[in-house]
């Protein structure tokens, strides 16, 4: 499992010209599922995502988490994150979870995040062609692994 987080002033996901998820200040998280991702990994990643300190405190240091700020969380499935890009000129997706496994894992991850982040969690639409827009704040971007 990989999660690419970006601190955002705002972010939205459109499918077929319809907004399916949007947030104000918070985090956009692109989520790539890998074969065999476990419940423990999903739980750990949710804890890291909600507790990772990427927001400024009063002194301007990145010392506050999404949990601290009460910001929005927009989760978007993105199987291309799990691509193997080490050789050649074309990515291989054999390291990404098969679609049914990835959807089940992603949905469980969303559920865990919703249980632990009262301000709310928005999502894209699994498997759909999505148009994702964000106003990147910083930019601040991190790749998390459980």
From Swiss-Prot:
Q: Which GO terms describe its cellular component?
A: cytoplasm
Enumerate the subcellular locations listed in this protein's record, separating them with semicolons: Cytoplasm
Mind telling me which InterPro entries this protein's record contains?
A: Daa-tRNA_deacyls_DTD, DTD-like_sf
Q: Name one GO biological process term.
A: D-amino acid catabolic process
Q: Which Pfam families match?
A: Tyr_Deacylase (PF02580)
Its recorded reaction(s) are: glycyl-tRNA(Ala) + H2O = tRNA(Ala) + glycine + H(+); a D-aminoacyl-tRNA + H2O = a tRNA + a D-alpha-amino acid + H(+)
Q: What is its EC number?
A: 3.1.1.96
Any notes on this protein's domains? A Gly-cisPro motif from one monomer fits into the active site of the other monomer to allow specific chiral rejection of L-amino acids.
The cross-references to PANTHER family, in alphabetical order and at most eight, read: D-AMINOACYL-TRNA DEACYLASE 1, D-TYROSYL-TRNA TYR DEACYLASE
Q: What HAMAP family does this protein map onto? A: Deacylase_Dtd (MF_00518)
What family, per the record? Answer: Belongs to the DTD family.
State what protein this is by name: D-aminoacyl-tRNA deacylase
- Source organism per entry reads Stenotrophomonas maltophilia (strain R551-3)
